Amino acid sequence: MRFLLVLQLVFFYFSAATTNSPKKCSRNSINLGKLIDTLLTDYDTHLLPEAEGVNVTIELHVQGVSGISEITGDFSLDVMYSEIWQDPRLSFKHLNVCATNITLKSDFRKKIWTPDTCIINSKSSSIHSSPSENTFVILYENGLVWSNFRLNVKTPCSVNLKMFPFDSLSCEIVLESYSFNTDEVRLMWHDVPITMMEKVELPDFDLIGWSTDHQRLEYPNGIWDRAKVKFTFARRYGFYLFQSYFPTSLTVISSWVGFFFDVRSVSARITLGVSSLLALTFQFGNVLRHLPRVSYIKCLDVWMIFSVIFIFCTLVELAIVCQLNRWERERQIGSKVLGHWLNQIRKTRKKESKADEGGGGGVGGLLRKRIPVLAQLKAAATDSNSGAATAMTTAIQPPNTNLNSITNSDNSKLVANNFTSIEHETYAYEKKRGFSHCFQRFVYAICPPDRDWTITSVQVDRCSMIMFPLSFLIFNVVYWSIYFMKMDRPM
């Protein structure tokens, strides 16, 4: 009796262990066709899985970014898009199938209810087919449906080139349910909404971050859920530093070499300035060729405009130097003429002194002849370029005067006073004839004639050697300080 009791206990133990052990079976033993037919019996694809609406969880797995175009304002990327929802009608836990989930092809998706989500702002999108359509559906035993697509998507980007080439772009992907409002489908992001297969690297941009957002948008026929992800790309400005900023800086600096040339090397300095200006224009046009035509000023535009101004100012400086050099040559010729007729006056005074000793003539004749002599001398000085200096030496003859009626001491004093006041009387004579008398008095009050205000071409060149580099240095400090402070990303 005791032996039978022990056998009964052993039997119950092994039977309980067998019942509690998990089923071990092969997936090949599952008849998926029969299972699908069973699940889809009396299944209506137009009815919601649940009357109170469906919560759809979405996530994106970015495989790579193909490229970004500022001209068209969009970017392309390859992404695996997943959407997950609960459909109790597809639960097969009660069927004692030897699997917790089954993977089905894209054809199965057409036979069940789907949330009909779409990328609402896409310019173009397509499902990869390599070689077959990259779509699958995973069905769990509790009725959880996981649908996945491998897509190539092109969506718009917000392009603002005011900070170019230190700018950043924002590109968005906006997801909505095309057919169902919030009473039927509610979109929500997964706990880990965005994942990257690998680091995104582009020739011109770096992906510096992304962010997700959830919104509700009101349409005339209801309120729709909207899930949005924004990718932020920062431009790599190293290319523009080496292809735009450094060459233009060297072009501006090379235009200053003309300051060290001789003043008479006009053709060489003009060639240098014009060549620098053309090179700068060509560099600027090469950069603009790959950018959209915008009406606002970009960061690079400010640099190029000031570079053109610096080179143009070198040409203006050259024009000023050439004009000053011409005036200097005219003054040199005029000084030679002036020295010649001053010698003539000295000779005339000596002859008058000798004539005084001999007597006769009178002061009146000398005073009457002084003004015509001065007029001839002034005409000769102003017409120096035409060879009037040579003619003057023969045209001007000392006045033939006789001062016998005046004593030698009075005569000498009178002649000295008359000839020392030549410049003042000539100025007074011209002042009566001119129409700008008031302006002349104002200028003489500010710039006294006894001070040397002459500026030479050499002085202008020497001043330019200092002022142009100093101005360009100040511009660089202000330019880089302002735009580096405006940058919204680390260097």
Curated annotation (Swiss-Prot):
It comes from the Eukaryota. Keywords: Cell membrane, Disulfide bond, Glycoprotein, Ion channel, Ion transport, Ligand-gated ion channel, Membrane, Postsynaptic cell membrane, Receptor, Signal, Synapse, Transmembrane, Transmembrane helix, Transport. One of its GO terms (molecular function) is transmembrane signaling receptor activity. One of its GO terms (cellular component) is postsynaptic membrane. Its main location: membrane. Glycans are attached at residues 55, 101, 418. This is Ligand-gated ion channel 50. The lineage of its organism: Eukaryota, Metazoa, Ecdysozoa, Nematoda, Chromadorea. The gene is lgc-50.
